[in-house]
């Protein structure tokens, strides 16, 4: 099945940009420290792999799903190998005290990607799910911004 043909394209969406800006991307990533929150989810894994490929000084990945994190690390190790930088994963909730301790103990990050989210949830389902959705998708982002500033 030719997915590109199905969506009316001949090339993946960002191929040209990645090719044109390859040097700038590599310099930016190679010289910086990254934190990816929700890094074991579908989008998080793709972002983590792209950063990893460019050998950052540090790449720390946080995700609440230990199983998805194990799969991410196995996939990266089997396809991309290792980097010179500090690559670590943490199976913790980004709203937890452990997460706060991690951020406070870190050397800081140049870039933080918050890709954590409750998806596929009908927010009108019940008030408890709605409260959790607001906590994960909004309040944890606000807390991370505050922790990064401190």
Residue ranges and their predicted role:
Residues 1-5:
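Charged, amphipathic alpha-helical linker segments immediately N-terminal to NTP-binding catalytic cores
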Residues 8-32:
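A short, basic/flexible loop-to-alpha-helix module at the beginning of a structural domain
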Residues 33-54:
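N-terminal Rossmann NAD(P)H-binding glycine-rich loop of SDR-like oxidoreductase domains
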Residues 50-61, 77-79, 83, 92-134:
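NAD(P)H-binding glycine-rich loop region in Rossmannoid oxidoreductase-like domains
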Residues 72-73:
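Conserved SAM-binding loop
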């Amino acid at each position: 099945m030719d997915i590109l043909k199905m969506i009316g394209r001949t090339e993946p969406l960002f191929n040209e940009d990645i090719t044109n800006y390859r040097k700038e991307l590599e310099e930016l990533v190679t010289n910086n420290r990254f934190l990816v929150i929700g890094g074991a989810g579908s989008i998080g894994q793709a972002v983590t792999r792209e950063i990893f490929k460019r050998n950052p000084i540090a790449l720390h990945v946080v995700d609440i799903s230990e199983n998805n994190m194990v799969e991410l690390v196995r996939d990266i190790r089997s396809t991309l190998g290792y980097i010179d930088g500090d690559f670590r994963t943490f199976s913790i909730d980004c709203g937890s005290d452990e997460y706060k301790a991690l951020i406070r103990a870190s050397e800081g990050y140049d870039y933080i990607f918050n890709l954590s989210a409750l998806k596929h949830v009908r927010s009108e389902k019940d008030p408890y799910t709605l409260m959790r959705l607001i906590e994960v998708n909004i309040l944890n982002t606000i807390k991370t911004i505050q922790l990064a500033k401190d």
